[in-house]
């Protein structure tokens, strides 16, 4: 099995249990945050409440960002958003955050010696741990494909770029 197939397989397994890009647990967290800040029970939240709800979910939105988000999603122009609109917006936000975070976590797993780079040695170790019988030549090809600046190692940006290119994240 190739490295790409291994990553595809792992990614597929990870996606199981997700509905609409979010796990049921994440959807429940979003519902709880929305309900908590819909203090009047109207089924909608305004810009101020949106900011607080997003903070409760671990985001730090700026005032301008909040205004733009409401304008983008509040097609009726009411100045408020309902739960479905909030869920749609947070699904997108969490998806953006999750993919970057997942890729960085994966990078750190490869970079076990904390050099800030993935070397051929790191790649060999991971392949061995995964039970992949890859030759040095195959591992070198993988390194070469990701190594855009030609320094023989893969930095975080190069890793992020190659992972996004594979359409797995």
UniProtKB/Swiss-Prot annotation:
InterPro entries (UniProt xref): CALM/Myosin/TropC-like (IPR050230), EF-hand-dom_pair (IPR011992), EF_Hand_1_Ca_BS (IPR018247), EF_hand_dom (IPR002048)
Stretches for region Disordered: 1-24
Keyword Glycoprotein listed: no
Sequence ranges assigned to domain EF-hand in this UniProt record: 25-60, 61-96, 98-133, 134-169
Positions annotated to bind Ca(2+) 2: 147, 149, 151, 153, 158
Residues engaged in binding Ca(2+) 1: 38, 40, 42, 44, 49
Record key words, sorted: Calcium, Cell cycle, Cell division, Metal-binding, Mitosis, Repeat
One GO BP annotation of this record: cell division
GO cellular component, one term: myosin II complex
A Pfam family that the UniProt record links to this protein: EF-hand_7
Molecular-function GO terms, alphabetical: calcium ion binding
Cell division recorded as keyword: yes
Stored CDD domains: EFh
Family listed: Belongs to the centrin family.
Functional summary from the UniProt entry: This calcium-binding protein is found in the basal body complexes (the functional homolog of the centrosome in animal cell). In mitotic cells it is specifically associated with the poles of the mitotic spindles at the sites of the duplicated basal body complexes.
Protein name per UniProt: Caltractin
